[in-house]
Regions:
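Mid-domain alpha/beta scaffold segments of enzyme catalytic cores
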Residues: 1-289
């Protein structure tokens, strides 16, 4: 979905973004990202060298030698069929998805869930696809990344019936109020905030961020959508997460360099614990393909 994934990874490195979770929807894009990712990382290294050289040249003679090449972000994959495409989740695709979950680069099943705003798949079909992928995530020992839009009641009820995965549940790109956030937090979920946290009229989203325990908070971009302020209206990239993180520091009162560093370290630790974990027993088993 990004125009130039390699360039975006290089930009992440330049801005100190150390971890990226990319999304694969096999009903929409197939599994091409799995094959393309090594090439993107190689291209990103070349882009990064060019960026550092250009920055050094701008600083004058010898400037290009003064900055070491920053590391590219670690990249993991969340794979799952989005509720928009639930109508395309056949038994064969479920089986193919299950095999891809054995790839040790995969760290979550998602985005999965319900979208009653667009209703691009019939609601009963969305619910069945959601259930099927919750079960698959639990079998694989992986967390789920949720897309919920105007469907939080049904989504929560389904998770309560199926059982929240022990590996974790991440409510993606949260843009509602504290009352809604509370029940997900009480159920042990992580909450990720993206661009909406920065929107000028979204005080209810900032209210929600204040009630989420700091060890359950993540930041994200939902790139190429939901570009944060002050860049709203432009195409969003993963590196734009720095704007959201800056606003989250303000919202939570991290108003000194030391407090900001502590909070940002906690956010990174949360993402690493949930999404950059060691291979699961499922992933260590031989493929059944």
């Amino acid at each position: 979905m990004l125009r130039d994934p390699a360039l975006e990874l290089a930009r992440c490195a330049m801005h100190g973004v150390a971890f990226v979770e990319t999304i694969v929807d096999p009903a929409d894009d197939g599994f091409g990202t799995f094959e393309a990712l090594p090439g993107w990382l190689m291209e990103a290294s070349a882009d990064l060298r060019a960026m550092v050289a250009a920055e050094g040249a701008g600083e004058g003679a010898g400037g290009e030698e003064r900055r070491a090449l920053p590391p590219l972000p670690a990249v993991r994959i969340a794979a799952g069929v989005h509720p928009h495409n639930a109508k395309d989740l056949t038994d064969d695709l479920v089986a193919a998805l299950g095999e891809r979950l054995r790839d040790r680069r995969v760290s979550a099943v998602g985005e999965i869930g319900l979208d009653y705003h667009y209703d691009l798949s019939p609601r009963p079909v969305q619910r069945e696809a959601f259930r099927a992928q919750i079960r698959l995530a639990k079998a694989a020992g992986l967390p789920v990344v949720l897309h919920m839009r105007e469907a939080h009641d049904d989504g929560f009820a389904i998770l309560a019936e199926e059982g929240f995965p022990e590996a974790g549940t991440l409510l993606h790109c949260f843009n509602l109020d504290g009352a809604e956030a509370s029940r997900w937090v009480e159920a042990g979920c992580y909450i990720a905030f993206g661009g909406p946290l920065t929107f000028k009229r979204a005080e209810e989203v900032r209210e929600a961020a204040r009630i989420v325990p700091v060890n359950r908070l993540l930041t994200e971009t939902d790139a190429p959508y939901m570009t944060p302020e002050p860049l709203r209206g432009t195409l969003c990239g993963p590196a734009h997460v720095v704007w959201t993180a800056a606003v989250l520091c303000e919202v939570l009162g991290a108003d000194t360099p030391e407090a900001r560093a502590t909070l940002l370290a906690q956010l990174y630790a949360n993402a690493e614990a949930l999404l950059d974990r060691a291979p699961t027993p499922w992933q260590k088993e031989p493929s059944h393909a």
